[in-house]
Amino acid sequence: MIRMEGQSNSIAIMCVVINVTLMYSFQIKGKIKIMGLFTGNFYSKNLRMTTQINVIFPDVSNDVTPLYEGTPKVLYLLHGLSGNSDEWTRFSKIEYYAKKYNFIIIMPEVQRSFYTTGKVGIDYFHYVADELPAICGKWFHLDQRRENTFIAGESMGGYGAVKIALNRPEKYEAVASLSGVLDYVGFTEMVLAGNWEDMSPQEIQSFHGEAGKPEEWENPLFLVEKLAKDENRPRLIQFCGTE
C-alpha cells in the first residue's frame, strides 16, 4: 500500500472548499443565483441506507425564459411506480417550468414503495414527509413557509403527494395528483386479487401486513373527507389519466 503524506489533509481541505463554493453559489444575500440540476447521494436515517435526490434551481440566464423575480417557491415532485428520481428530468420540461415559474424542484428516490412506512419494508413515508424537507431546508436555505411549499406527483407519486400533504396539512399550500391512485383501498384489493400484472400481492402485504389492508391515514379518500371542513386544508387538484 502506497501512503501519500498529507493526502487526508488535502482531501479534507478540498471538501471544505467545494462545500463553501456550493453554498455561496446557491445563496447570495438570501437569493438563489444559479441554474442547476443538483444530483446528490446521502445517508437517510429513516431509510437506513444511502439514497439519491435531484434538485433543480432557477437561473439568471435569458436563453429560454427570463428569471422570475422574488423568492423561489419549493415543489416536492414525486415519481411513479416504475420510475425513479430521474423520471421528471428525463421525460418532461420540468427544468424549463422551474425557471419560468420560479420553483426549486426536489425529486426524491423511493423505489416501488408507494410512499409507505412498510410493515416489513422501508419507511419512505417519514423520509419524504419529514426527513427530506429538514435536510433540504438546511442544505439549500429554503423558504419553508407553508404558503411557499407545494407537493405533486404522478400515478404512485400522485398518491404519495396527496397522502403526505393531507397528513401534514400545516406544511403545504397545495397538492397536485396526476393520474394518482386515490382509491388506494380499491387498488390494494385489486392487486391482492391478482388482477394487476404490474404489482404482486406480496408487495402490498409488505406495506400493510398479511391482510394487505391500509390504515385510515394511508387512505386519501378518508383523509379528504376528514379535512373537508378544515379551512386550513391544502388546496388539492386531481388530474385523471386517459387510459
Regions inferred by a protein language model and the residue ranges of each:
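Non-catalytic cap/lid and distal C-terminal segments of serine-dependent acyl enzymes
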Residues: 3-7, 13-243
